[in-house]
Amino acid sequence: MSSDEEDFNDIYGDDKPTTTEEVKKEEEQNKAGSGTSQLDQLAALQALSSSLNKLNNPNSNNSSSNNSNQDTSSSKQDGTANDKEGSNEDTKNEKKQESATSANANANASSAGPSGLPWEQLQQTMSQFQQPSSQSPPQQQVTQTKEERSKADLSKESCKMFIGGLNWDTTEDNLREYFGKYGTVTDLKIMKDPATGRSRGFGFLSFEKPSSVDEVVKTQHILDGKVIDPKRAIPRDEQDKTGKIFVGGIGPDVRPKEFEEFFSQWGTIIDAQLMLDKDTGQSRGFGFVTYDSADAVDRVCQNKFIDFKDRKIEIKRAEPRHMQQKSSNNGGNNGGNNMNRRGGNFGNQGDFNQMYQNPMMGGYNPMMNPQAMTDYYQKMQEYYQQMQKQTGMDYTQMYQQQMQQMAMMMPGFAMPPNAMTLNQPQQDSNATQGSPAPSDSDNNKSNDVQTIGNTSNTDSGSPPLNLPNGPKGPSQYNDDHNSGYGYNRDRGDRDRNDRDRDYNHRSGGNHRRNGRGGRGGYNRRNNGYHPYNR
């Protein structure tokens, strides 16, 4: 590198890099837009101002640079011819560059404002500052609108309060006098029963300033010997936006103020109510906290148990009463809907409850299809047959009424064949097991349905049922003896045998008077003794 080039770089070397850096910085700032932070923008502005100051300095040094160029050109003339030609070409190029640089500097100086900065660059810089500010507010507005929608707006009734737990004898004058020490009471009303005119135990109160409401909710209040419960009045259209939790397991030494301060870390509290004993003034172990949004409730309910003053307290969501009623009703309806999804339709919820309150169903849950209904009817028949065998009573009429009721409850399902007859399933089961068909004589001796006066007999081919003995009819000695079962030594049978012996004794006496009786009608085989037949 020649000395001329070194001198040129020393004088004008910072000009080109500076201008290129300016263009690059401006392009980067235009591309970055809202993505650059304010700190980066300030740094870019400082760099821009410093570069502009450097641009102004070459204008003042143009004369000195021209003189130096003339000196260098004169020194070059002392060399060889080749050197002169090369130096002349270099000087020509340098002059061209110098003229272009000076023209740019003059243009910048002419376009500079009062402060010495170019208007175009100032406008670009200002636009860079304005773009983030113009874009950031919409994002902030979106987040703010979301929060405003999720939070309850209490500004409509910020001066109104709900007063609960009032004494029956508390009047509006007493209530106004008590709360008048917290501020000017503008409106007050105690709700009364329209029929009796007696107080319903709660009312509403309005102050002139919201600060009075803030003072009231900080402390506990006792009026006419009873602890009252003043709360902020929440508009009906804002109640769904609020969230309430139940807190249990609170220590007896916890005070209302520290209770509220502890739960304020999860959100803005509308009302914090720690239940206190009116006699001792200590905590009763539970309380309620109302937040201005449901998001705060979600945050505090992430853990079921929280440490508070060296104790584990329990956190639950507190639902309003009308929501609890809806959930209970939905639970009952879901039960009916589940049965409907299985293929059946009970018509309404009342029929569903009526069917499951029937003791004959015994927890049996039928599937609503023909095969399941057939199995259900068969199960009902077996149940009534078992009851007949245990009690000795005829349940045919009761069974038919039950079947008719089931037919009315489910009109869409046809009754299976022989559903109204009680004895048919048992006979069919005997036939399928291979037992012989009963004859007329067997039916006279023992039927499947036991009635009063007949003794139940079991077939030797089938295992006997382990059922309790029911009431028995009069003994038939001859039938028992012929069938091989022997004598029945039951006490009830002995009492019946005594009556039978009395009858036989009288009949035997009549035969003796006719000359054909034996021993006065007394039958030794009866093995009994009657006191009136001596």
Curated annotation (Swiss-Prot):
Chain positions with Omega-N-methylarginine modification: 519
Keyword Transmembrane: no
InterPro entries attached to this UniProt entry: Hrp1_RRM1, Nucleotide-bd_a/b_plait_sf, RBD_domain_sf, RRM_dom
GO MF entries: mRNA binding; RNA binding
Subcellular location, record wording: Cytoplasm; Nucleus; Cytoplasm, Stress granule
Keywords: Cytoplasm, Methylation, mRNA processing, Nonsense-mediated mRNA decay, Nucleus, Phosphoprotein, Repeat, RNA-binding
Comp. bias intervals (Low complexity): 37-78, 99-112, 121-144, 336-354, 460-475, 523-534
GO biological process terms, semicolon-separated: mRNA processing; nuclear-transcribed mRNA catabolic process, nonsense-mediated decay; response to DNA damage checkpoint signaling
Keyword Transmembrane helix: no
Processing and modification events after translation: Methylated by HMT1. The methylation is required for nuclear export.
Superkingdom, natural source: Eukaryota
Region span, Disordered: 1-154, 316-354, 415-534
Phosphothreonine modified-residue sites: 458
RRM domain span: 159-241, 243-320
Compositionally skewed regions (Polar residues) per UniProt: 420-459
Basic and acidic residues composition-biased segments: 13-30, 81-98, 145-154, 478-505
GO cellular component terms listed in the entry, alphabetical order: cytoplasm; cytoplasmic stress granule; mRNA cleavage factor complex; nucleus
Broad class of where this protein is predominantly found: cytoplasm
Gene3D superfamilies: 3.30.70.330
Modification sites for Phosphoserine: 2-3, 51, 87, 206, 460, 462
Assembly behavior: Interacts with NAM7.
Described function: RNA-binding protein, which is involved in the polyadenylation-dependent pre-mRNA 3'-end formation and cooperates with the cleavage factor CFIA complex and the cleavage and polyadenylation factor (CPF) complex. May be involved in regulation of poly(A) site selection. Is involved in nonsense-mediated mRNA decay. Seems to bind to an RNA downstream sequence element (DSE) located 3' of a nonsense codon and may mark the transcript for decay.
Protein's name according to its UniProt entry: Nuclear polyadenylated RNA-binding protein 4
Name of the coding gene: HRP1
